[in-house]
């Protein structure tokens, strides 16, 4: 996902944004690589256009393995597939951070079981830890199924599974709200070794 940062300004009034790569799960992988020097990879899907290639370049700069990027043919306008955008205002003083997601019809939201070769990742390549969370699962009706598929294969190969509840009302609103988030999270919980959350999740 491409994150657009207006600096100290507001989304509604700024005239420029700085761009970063981002995403709840990706940020963990980047932190492990940049802060601790650990090998980390991201599994995601991007529309194959200039914005997708920008995200790829930013991931490269972050030092995260991108060999599991799934490229989806772009239709030229974004009717069928797009790359996710997240506009994020910084919080400081009494002003809370604020975000505006633009993530409908994204390549990652269209992932479905069978699209990713999890056996290769956890079997042949020997990945030892899998991390995902509520943001990915909120993107569509199929993303929780992809998370479950990955967890089942990871568990079979003895990898540790972590899950960040990371509840975002704006992402869950169109597919059932908090009740849907609770149902999805409870369904995945038995497969999780490390669950991360707080009283807001």
Predicted regions and their residues:
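Short secondary-structure boundary/capping elements
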Residues: 20-27, 113, 180
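Conserved N-terminal subdomain of the carbohydrate kinase-like
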Residues: 39-134
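Alpha-helix C-terminal capping segments
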Residues: 20, 27-41, 61
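Short beta-strand segments at enzyme active-site cores
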Residues: 37, 41-44, 161-165
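Positively charged, low-complexity intrinsically disordered leader regions
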Residues: 1-11
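Conserved beta-alpha-beta core of the PfkB/ribokinase-like small-molecule kinase fold
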Residues: 129-201
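Short pre-catalytic strand/loop immediately N-terminal to key active-site residues, enriched for Gly-Thr
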Residues: 12-22
């Amino acid at each position: 996902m491409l994150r657009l940062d207006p600096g100290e300004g507001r989304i509604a009034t700024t005239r420029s944004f700085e761009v970063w790569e981002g995403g709840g799960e990706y940020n963990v992988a980047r932190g492990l690589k940049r802060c601790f020097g650990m090998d980390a990879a991201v599994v995601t899907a991007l529309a194959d256009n200039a914005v997708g290639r920008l995200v790829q370049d930013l991931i490269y700069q972050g030092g995260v393995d991108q060999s599991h990027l799934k490229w989806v043919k772009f239709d030229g306008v974004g009717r069928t597939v797009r790359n996710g955008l997240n506009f994020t205002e910084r919080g400081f003083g009494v002003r809370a951070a604020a975000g505006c997601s633009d993530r409908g019809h994204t390549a990652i939201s269209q992932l479905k079981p069978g699209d990713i070769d999890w056996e290769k990742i956890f079997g042949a390549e020997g990945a030892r830890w899998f991390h995902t969370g509520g943001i990915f699962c909120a993107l569509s009706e199929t993303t929780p199924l992809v998370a479950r598929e990955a967890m089942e294969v990871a568990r079979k190969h003895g990898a540790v599974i972590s899950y960040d509840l990371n509840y975002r009302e704006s992402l869950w609103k169109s597919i059932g709200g908090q009740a849907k988030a609770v149902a999805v999270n409870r369904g995945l919980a038995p497969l999780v070794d490390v669950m991360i959350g707080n009283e807001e999740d």
